[in-house]
Swiss-Prot record:
Positions of S-palmitoyl cysteine lipidation: C91, C94
Name of the protein in question: Sphingoid long chain base kinase 5
Any one GO molecular-function label of the UniProt entry: ATP binding
Sites where the protein binds substrate: S333, G334, D335, G336
Taxon lineage: Eukaryota, Fungi, Dikarya, Ascomycota, Saccharomycotina
Gene Ontology CC terms, in alphabetical order: cytoplasm; cytosol; Golgi apparatus; Golgi membrane; intracellular membrane-bounded organelle; membrane; nucleus
Biological source species: Saccharomyces cerevisiae (strain ATCC 204508 / S288c) (Baker's yeast)
């Protein structure tokens, strides 16, 4: 009894595998699906479809238009009328949502290595049904492309009926020809079909196509619910290659697609992945395996995965790894693992080579994920991975921390922030409720504010921009040059590709500030204009690691002491280099990647609760720095001397001892991956 339905399902499955190969062309924005010529077959289907849908036609159209970013299309031919409606406003979100990603990649071993060069035939779900005419697959989403040597048996030409084999005569029909011309053409086609059926061969028909039409399989990242997943689609792409002495004609099309898809970024990255299985809610491994790994393999990145087993393990891993085998370290974690990796590389005898060769980035799988939100503009693991694949290698400033207990042995590097007072205690003392995720920060801050606890100390500062007006001028001056000042890459407005594509405008994100308008990205076109010739200027040297203000030499004379009336009643002391310190906390809206300064924010513990309310409510927008009770400055270095007997510092979310802390900026020391070559736009210039 149970076998019969199973056989019927299998039979239907085999029949449903017959799919269409669609024609496409290359455009400046991506690969665009060509408008398909009408035929008696499609015309009859359209008429039948209209009759069956006449009673709900208006409803279906309204529903589609109001839910375009989340609409899922079925794979049968009854949707042709909807595709006609959508043709002018279609995008990659219109593709079928019925397939699931391949779960076979979810390895359970502690370490694994995946190299696509050894397994070039990875299988990804294909797109069900036709792609609407005028759909554009942006270069920013294309992961890989390759030629298909032979036409798959389960495909047929989208321009002909499913019962007829491929024929070049149909592909050459004008898109504007009328029904009579189509009928005449099909008569000729049927004659050709009878001959081909007699010889049982379709290869002769394929060879009659234009020599500039190639059958290509494209793997791209398609939105699925709140993520992106790799999908493949076979396309007949019309492309006439330019004359080239170093490219063969048959290689030119795929090479051109990949060049446009990976402009200004490294192809086939060699990635060393460090996963903290205990980070966040303990789901880092699952998030990486299901959300990130399929995209990395689809883009032909070679990856090696290791897992941390205890606090500080990533320091040892980075200190002992073979840096010649990799160009990127991806931390599938929160912000703690990038901190350990940076310091592990710093402790290497060949740290100069390590920081020159390797880019450090984050796949958000922890509680904070500030690095991903600031650099990739997203807290979503799959979108962050797509940005990792497509982003520009950029140098950012680091901060060097010195305390008496470890300064002589080895100073510590910080990429994110240092904090003392209310925020520090909240960050560290809520570790026991890590299972709550980011909500633990909000709960801890609210509890500490109600207590109005003071953290007396002495603070000495070397300012770069002391007042808020000076800071604003500094920000406006460096926003358009500081962040990409040292990038030797080439881009112009006529050939911008994925780097100006909004990866997240097709799904609702938890962080609304991640969504960027296309106009904002257009402003970056004139920023990325450096010459590739002098790449050695971007290399750091040993002297770049030299500390300008050693801890044992005392406080320099040009440093200013903060008013004791403020420092003795300190509520929050926070310095940082990235705009976000958590997915929903824009604490340093004026932070820039490489402006040579860090931001300092200070509050007074005596501030009333009624005045603290707008400060806290403005953290998600970054408007808290505009409040008169908040001190906001750009600084080059500082020293803070606590007066309490117990407490702690938090550096990049890690606990540091309560003893004098001295920090200075170290310009452009670390190489990371920034979307569009800059931090996420905080709109600080319009505040």
């Amino acid at each position: 009894m149970t076998l019969k339905p199973s056989k019927r399902r299998k039979g239907r499955s085999r029949h449903s595998r017959k799919k269409q190969i669609t024609s496409a062309i290359l455009t400046e924005e991506g690969i665009m699906i060509k408008a398909k010529p009408s035929s008696p077959y499609t015309y009859a289907n359209r008429m039948a479809d209209k009759r069956s849908r006449s009673s709900i036609d208006n409803i279906s159209r309204t529903s589609f238009q109001s839910n375009i970013s989340r609409t899922s299309f079925q794979s049968n031919s009854d949707n042709n009328s909807i595709f006609e409606t959508a043709s002018l406003i279609s995008c990659v979100t219109c593709l079928s949502d019925t397939d699931t990603i391949d779960r076979s990649e979810t390895s359970t071993t502690d370490t694994s290595k995946d190299d696509l060069s050894a397994n070039p035939k990875l299988h990804y779900p294909s797109v069900n049904g036709q792609l609407p005419a005028n759909t554009v697959i942006p270069y920013g989403r294309i992961l890989d492309a390759r030629y298909i040597e032979k036409e798959p048996l389960h495909y047929y030409d989208a321009n002909s009926s499913p019962s007829s084999p491929l024929s070049s005569s149909m592909s050459n029909i004008s898109e504007k020809c009328d029904l009579d011309e189509l009928e005449s053409s099909q008569k000729k086609e049927r004659k050709g079909n009878s001959l081909s059926r007699g010889s049982n061969s379709s290869s002769s028909l394929l060879t009659s196509r234009s020599p500039f039409t190639k059958l290509v399989e494209v793997i791209f990242a398609r939105p699925r619910r709140h993520d992106v997943v790799p999908k493949r689609v076979s396309l007949y792409i019309d492309y006439k290659p330019h004359s080239s002495s170093h490219l063969k004609e048959e290689d030119d099309l795929v090479e051109e697609i990949l060049k446009r898809s990976y402009k200004n970024t490294r192809r086939n990255k060699s990635i060393f992945v460090i996963i903290n299985p205990f980070g966040g809610k303990g789901k880092a491994k699952k998030l990486f395996m299901t959300k990130a790994k399929p995209l990395l393999l689809a883009s032909r990145c070679s990856i090696e995965v290791v897992y941390t087993k205890y606090p500080g393990h990533a320091i040892e891993i980075a200190r002992e790894m073979d840096i010649d085998k990799y160009d990127t370290i991806a931390c599938a974690s929160g912000d703690g693992i990038p901190h350990e990796v940076i310091n592990g590389l710093y402790q290497r005898p060949d740290h100069v080579k390590a920081f020159n060769n390797i880019a450090i980035t984050e796949i958000p799988c922890g509680s904070g994920n500030a690095m991903s939100v600031s650099c990739h503009w997203t807290n979503n693991p799959s979108y962050s991975t797509l940005c990792l694949i497509k982003s520009i290698e950029t140098r950012i400033d680091l901060m060097c921390c010195s305390q008496p207990s470890y300064a002589r042995e080895h100073p510590k590097l910080s990429f994110l922030s240092q904090t003392y007072g209310l925020i520090a205690e909240t960050d560290i003392n809520t570790e026991f409720i890590r299972w709550m995720g980011p909500a633990r920060f909000e709960l801890g801050v609210a509890f500490n504010i109600i207590q109005k606890k003071k953290y007396p100390c002495e603070i000495y500062v070397k300012y770069a921009a002391k007042s808020k007006n000076e800071l604003k001028n500094h920000y406006l001056e460096h926003k358009n040059k500081g962040s990409l000042e040292f990038q030797h890459i080439t881009m112009n407005k006529d050939n911008e590709d994925c780097d100006n594509y909004n990866y997240e405008n097709e799904y609702e994100t938890e962080n609304e500030d991640e969504d960027e308008d296309a106009d904002a990205d257009d402003e970056d076109s004139h920023l990325i204009s450096r010459d590739l010739a002098d790449s050695s200027a971007d290399q750091i040297k040993e002297e770049d690691f030299k500390i300008k203000y050693p801890l044992d030499e005392g406080i320099p004379s040009d440093w200013e002491r903060l008013d004791p009336n403020i420092s003795n009643n300190l509520g929050i002391f926070y310095t940082g280099k990235m705009p976000y310190v958590a997915a929903d906390t824009k604490f340093f809206p004026a932070a820039l990647p490489s402006d040579g300064t860090m931001d300092m924010v200070i509050t007074d513990a005596r501030t009333s609760l009624t005045r603290m309310a707008p400060i806290l409510l403005g953290l998600d927008k970054g408007s808290h720095v505009l409040q008169p009770e908040v001190l906001h400055s750009k600084i080059l270095a500082y020293k803070i001397i606590p007066k309490l007997g117990n407490g702690l510092f938090s550096v990049d979310g890690e606990k540091f001892p309560l003893e004098p802390l001295q920090v200075e900026i170290m310009p452009r020391l670390c190489k990371t991956l920034l979307r569009n070559g800059r931090y996420v736009d905080t709109d600080f210039d319009s505040m």
